[in-house]
């Protein structure tokens, strides 16, 4: 199913943040994955940086755990979804 992305960077970041919050609140996801999602969320909320830099920092935090063998498949799909959304954020 195709997802319609918001046209503006802040809309994309808010969409990514909402997906990250669902991962953080899911107790079926291992703690290290939730911690990485929380770290990515912190990067996205940093007002001192431009949207593209915030997105790049969050992607970096998520890519470290995206191949974790203990991650449930649905969580991996959500992580990849967030990365895909954030890759479209440009300054």
UniProtKB/Swiss-Prot annotation:
Coiled coil: none annotated. InterPro entries: Ta0600-like_sf, UPF0147. It comes from the Archaea. It holds the Pfam family UPF0147. Belongs to the UPF0147 family. This is UPF0147 protein APE_2336a. It comes from Aeropyrum pernix (strain ATCC 700893 / DSM 11879 / JCM 9820 / NBRC 100138 / K1).
């Amino acid at each position: 199913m195709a997802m319609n992305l918001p046209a503006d960077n802040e809309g994309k970041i808010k969409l990514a943040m909402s997906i990250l919050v669902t991962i953080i609140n899911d107790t079926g996801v291992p703690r290290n994955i939730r911690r990485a999602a929380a770290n990515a969320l912190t990067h996205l909320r940093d007002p001192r940086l431009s949207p593209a830099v915030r997105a790049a920092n969050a992607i970096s935090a998520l890519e470290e755990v995206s191949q974790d063998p203990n991650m449930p498949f649905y969580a991996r799909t959500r992580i990849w979804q967030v990365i895909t959304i954030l890759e479209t954020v440009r300054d």
